[in-house]
Structure formats: C-alpha cells, structure tokens
UniProtKB/Swiss-Prot annotation:
Residues 1-19 form the signal peptide. Keywords: Amidation, Disulfide bond, G-protein coupled acetylcholine receptor impairing toxin, G-protein coupled receptor impairing toxin, Ion channel impairing toxin, Neurotoxin, Secreted, Signal, Toxin, Voltage-gated sodium channel impairing toxin. Expressed by the venom gland. One of its GO terms (molecular function) is toxin activity. Has the structural arrangement of an alpha-helix connected to antiparallel beta-sheets by disulfide bonds (CS-alpha/beta). InterPro entries: LCN-type_CS_alpha_beta_dom, Scorpion_toxin-like, Scorpion_toxin-like_sf, Scorpion_toxinL, Scorpion_toxinL/defensin. The keyword Flavoprotein does not apply. The modification Serine amide is found at S83. It comes from Tityus serrulatus. This is Alpha-mammal toxin Ts3.
Length: 86
C-alpha cells in the first residue's frame, strides 16, 4: 500500500514535465549555427527562439551553444554536416 501511494506521488510530480538539454542546435541538415564575429546576442536570440533558456557563441568552434533546449529540438550529433542537401 505504501509503495502504491509513493508511485502515485511520483507520477503526479513528474506529470507534464519536459526534459531539457544543452547542446549545439542544428538545422535540418545536421549543420550547427555559425556565429561569425562571436555574436553572443545572435546566439542567445536564436536559442530563445528555439525555446531554450539562453545561449552564447562558443568561440572555440564559432558555433551557437544553447542551455535548456527542449528534448524535441535536434542538436549536433557525430554525423557529418550535409550542407546544401534537403
């Protein structure tokens, strides 16, 4: 009986929650967004448009990096960027 109550409480606490992740957002072709001139404002706006909490230009790779992206938003994988192909 105690386990049943615990299970109900856990289900109620997790119902409706959406996971968040950090990473490099990508376009349809697995290409990350480039931030020329190290433009943090551009990356922050891009990330927030994708429902992330915030973002910045990661200067080592010159790519936008987002914090708190929804799980449904694709991020950079190990696959190659297929620029120009749909």
């Amino acid at each position: 009986m105690n386990y049943f109550i615990l299970l109900v409480v856990v289900c109620l606490l997790t119902a409706g929650t959406e996971g968040k992740k950090d990473g490099y957002p990508v376009e349809y072709d697995n290409c990350a967004y480039i931030c020329w001139n190290y433009d943090n404002a551009y990356c922050d706006k891009l990330c927030k448009d994708k429902k992330a909490d915030s973002g910045y230009c990661y200067w080592v790779h010159i790519l936008c990096y987002c914090y708190g992206l929804p799980d449904s938003e694709p991020t950079k994988t190990n696959g190659k960027c297929k620029s120009g192909k749909k």
